[in-house]
Amino acid sequence: MSLNMFWFLPTHGDGHYLGTEEGSRPVDHGYLQQIAQAADRLGYTGVLIPTGRSCEDAWLVAASMIPVTQRLKFLVALRPSVTSPTVAARQAATLDRLSNGRALFNLVTGSDPQELAGDGVFLDHSERYEASAEFTQVWRRLLLGETVNFNGKHIHVRGAKLLFPPIQQPYPPLYFGGSSDVAQELAAEQVDLYLTWGEPPELVKEKIEQVRAKAAAYGRKIRFGIRLHVIVRETNDEAWQAAERLISHLDDETIAKAQAAFARTDSVGQQRMAALHNGKRDNLEISPNLWAGVGLVRGGAGTALVGDGPTVAARINEYAALGIDSFVLSGYPHLEEAYRVGELLFPHLDVAIPEIPQPQPLNPQGEAVANDFIPRKVAQS
């Protein structure tokens, strides 16, 4: 099975070390463009663009990278409860059309009550997943070309429609990650690819089996992906030394503050990440070559595969054997590590190198009539 390898655009900051200004660098458009172009040339399938108040806006960043890349796809967040599904469908179709079919979407429900309150969202965990399920139903139906009337608990639309369809049919693929039962149910019913953070293989296997069984109950099959950091070097010793350097400027106070911030979230996935290290520096290798040091201060994906190219490739193939076909990777700093992964790891894997998409001709159309419909040819009498 050929593997889809993704990279990451660090719109929330970048540098040589975690938890310090030491070794940091400005993350401006030029720098993000360098990373995107490196990923494009090296054969990555796409890039994940993060979302939230700590990040630049993912949609604007993705749009700005379209003209400077050729094949790279952009995995961009959909935010139920923050954006209406109708507006999100228009945005999604436009990004797909402008990029010639290079748009992918990642459903993000949110997990930090403090950040959500700042965005005007005051739903609890179960309510957010109710809203996300309704959002996704409407979003998908619009992209399928339906005129949608929907009267849910959280979402209400009447006569919603999309005049400009996406390039990818029936719609651009929808990704989603969540560890709670309600999250897995949403994934099983509505999404195309279920993402998990980098837990030990036995825990990942358990999640995959659960989601696969739930999807089968809906008569569906679902793909799987995993989100990991990577520290790959020419030797295993060099890789482990690089891992230790990454957290060499961390102090106990910074770790404690980070763990306190994570504790206020209601994310089951974040709780599972934190349990891998319990906020302590000792015993960070939680599974062969799987290191939890990143999660001491980074929310979300908190584990890294560490080793030389063949060793990391072996670990990746263990995950692939569980049914995972997509790997969303990152490393610090992201420009240099994009090259290291491409040069030291890719030769040891069966990497699916994306082709440059051919321009898709769009149908000629006149100006929309009354802001309501697209004019069609009228038979001449």
UniProtKB/Swiss-Prot annotation:
GO terms for molecular function: alkanesulfonate monooxygenase activity. Catalyzes the desulfonation of aliphatic sulfonates. It is an enzyme of class 1 (oxidoreductase). Its EC number is 1.14.14.5. InterPro entries: Alkanesulphonate_mOase_FMN-dep (IPR019911), Luciferase-like_dom (IPR011251), Luciferase-like_sf (IPR036661), SsuD_RutA_monooxygenase (IPR050172). FMNH(2) which is absolutely required for this enzymatic reaction, is provided by SsuE. Homotetramer. Pfam families: Bac_luciferase (PF00296). Belongs to the SsuD family. GO terms for biological process: alkanesulfonate catabolic process. SUPFAM superfamilies: Bacterial luciferase-like (SSF51679). This is Alkanesulfonate monooxygenase. Keywords: Flavoprotein, FMN, Monooxygenase, Oxidoreductase.
